[in-house]
């Protein structure tokens, strides 16, 4: 019985401690609202996880940088692992082997939640589960988020999808809509 209880707890608990700092250009743009909204829904998922006996932690912050070039450079060099930038800021750049797309956000502009390819796929998968488990709440956090859906958040664009997003997509589409 104890083993069964522990296995059930793992379904609801964070699979690991998560710490993310999401880089954005300005507090005045939608990128900042998206970053704060991601932190909010992940925190909600953590609260649910704790109510089922989970003991892991979440640290979610935003960091400002005025230049998209600097943000991309810091992600490429793995100084920071996450950023939200406008998709149009990536169009005229050479393809980069180290940038990966986590989610696309079709808000007032199209935005991309990116990371470095070296980020643990299980962390990315947990982030995706946290966002998708609370997609309804996420949609109501800002008027430009209302059209978000499962089908328009995970889209292969110019930047390749992160391995964690691919794993998440496979599990989500097969009906494994677990809590993290």
Where in this protein do the model-derived segments appear?
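Short, polar/charged alpha-helical segment
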Residues: 31-54
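Short helix-initiation/N-cap motifs at beta->coil->alpha
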Residues: 49-73, 77
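A bilobed periplasmic-binding-protein/Venus flytrap-type ligand-binding module shared by bacterial periplasmic
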Residues: 21-24, 106-123
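Beta->alpha turn/N-cap motifs
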Residues: 66-68, 78-90
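Ligand-binding "clamshell"
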Residues: 77, 92-108
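Extracytoplasmic "Venus flytrap"
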Residues: 19-37
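An extracytoplasmic/periplasmic, membrane-proximal ligand-sensing/linker region
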Residues: 132-180
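Short amphipathic alpha-helical coupling segments at ligand-binding clamshell hinges
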Residues: 34, 119-130
